[in-house]
């Protein structure tokens, strides 16, 4: 966060100092030595939760990507690129050996990873090959707006589909998380701006309004979880 503020808001030395301090702490304690990032640590750096969650990896990549941009450090850039490579290797099984699901029974594709990759690609744009970046952005847009976005359900976004992108008639297949979808539309709008595609921004805006209406608690206000 402090790296991003330094890069995009104001070149304040105290922000950069905080970012470097946090980056050095994570570099020393945040992973197992092979850039498998623990989910949480105590204040002394001892791991509390194993690296079962791929979002530990995505946020570490964002952090070191922005820190490399702020400092010009090749070491931080290499950490971000190595971690990003691990993320891509885990796309088909994000939880790896910590996956609790019985294999071969109900294989589902989850919305969370392609959604966060939309954001991650832009956050580390300066570290990626332009051709690869273009391909990644298009793949993420396709996954979010062609696979998980369901016009046959009134234009809402579902959390899980089968491995072929079809709806699944089960609890997980019927799950809708409005706030998650709205967050994803923010990322899609950013991609629309980056790619100069106003029609994509418009589609994301309309989907945001649809999800707000679908998920709104009309009695008490607020968005259902």
Give short role names for the model-derived ranges.
Residues 1-225:
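Glycan-recognition and catalytic cores of secretory/periplasmic carbohydrate-active enzymes
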